[in-house]
């Protein structure tokens, strides 16, 4: 079993609280865009936002991965956006873990602000699809590591 660290440096166990989801089967692009969106929010506000994404009522702005992504009239500043429901569910699980960890440490979970949010590449699942004439085509799938670090404000 591998031992995973965190990409956040300067972690203080008294002040900070953290949670992670390792090797989650979601899109790396959607995971990155959600991480950029929720960084700086309180945990309660981020949960409300992602529940809206899950119900396909609130779009997430796609800043980097925006080719062939439709425009959303609800977005301000960045016109391209989408509803990454699967990634939002994964982030909601990690956010609820972060909230529980904050309560366990004695922090006020309503005042915890997300100071570090990351969604980066994990392990690659390699699969091959058989084709005609004895050939095969690769069908690789990238897993994602999700990290959240919060601090009481």
Model-derived segments and their meaning:
Residues 134-153:
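C-terminal edge-of-domain segments
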Residues 109-132:
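Extended, charged amphipathic interaction segments
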Residues 26, 132-133:
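Short, solvent-exposed beta-edge and connector elements
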Residues 64-65, 127-129, 143:
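Surface-exposed beta-strand edges and their flanking turn/coil or helix-capping segments
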Residues 2-108, 149-150:
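Ribosome large-subunit tunnel/peptidyl-transferase-proximal elements
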């Amino acid at each position: 079993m591998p031992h995973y660290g965190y990409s956040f440096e300067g972690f203080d166990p008294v002040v900070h609280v953290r949670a992670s989801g390792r090797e989650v089967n979601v899109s790396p692009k959607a995971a990155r865009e959600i991480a950029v969106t929720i960084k700086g929010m309180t945990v309660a506000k981020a949960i409300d936002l992602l529940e809206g994404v899950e119900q396909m009522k609130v779009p997430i702005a796609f800043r980097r991965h925006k080719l062939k992504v439709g425009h959303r009239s609800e977005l301000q500043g960045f016109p391209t956006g989408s509803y990454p429901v699967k990634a939002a569910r994964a982030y909601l699980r990690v956010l609820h873990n972060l909230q529980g960890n904050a309560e366990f440490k004695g922090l006020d979970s309503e005042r915890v602000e997300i100071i570090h949010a990351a969604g980066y590449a994990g392990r690659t699942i390699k699969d091959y699809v058989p084709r005609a004439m004895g050939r095969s085509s690769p069908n690789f799938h990238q897993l994602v590591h999700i990290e959240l670090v919060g601090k009481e404000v």
